[in-house]
Amino acid sequence: MKLVVIVLLVISVSILVSAQELGGSRRYCGRHLAQTMAVLCWGIDEMSAEKRNSDMVYEDSGMPELLPADTRKKRGIIDECCLQACTRDVLLSYC
């Protein structure tokens, strides 16, 4: 009886892991999130990425609508894709 329960548990875990890897939700945090977004949104991989606009400075004007859209969305993508799992479609919605 114990063997049957263990086998069923192993099979269940395997199915869950496989489903998640086949296009289900994943968590993207830190550098992995940034690299994934660069590839999805701009087709840039780490090897060919150039530092663009590195000398641009955005001062805190108290008017967030004047900042680039990706600055405003930063917290949302972290909430949706780092603190909890998200799909590729959710990531693409932030491009």
Swiss-Prot record:
Record Gene3D superfamilies: Insulin-like
Family annotation (InterPro entries): Bombyxin, Insulin-like, Insulin-like_sf, Insulin_CS, Insulin_family
Cited SMART domains: IlGF
Coiled-coil ranges from the UniProt annotation: none
Keywords assigned: Cleavage on pair of basic residues, Disulfide bond, Hormone, Secreted, Signal
Residue numbers covered by the propeptide annotation in the UniProt entry: 53-71
GO cellular component terms listed in the entry, alphabetical order: extracellular space
Disulfide bonds: C29-C82, C41-C95, C81-C86
Record localization: Secreted
Location (main, coarse): secreted
Molecular-function GO term, any one: growth factor activity
One Pfam family cited in the UniProt record for this chain: Insulin
Signal peptide residue numbers: 1-19
Reported impact of T71A: In strain: Showa
Family affiliation: Belongs to the insulin family.
Complexes and interactors: Heterodimer of a B chain and an A chain linked by two disulfide bonds.
Protein name: Bombyxin F-1
Source organism: Bombyx mori
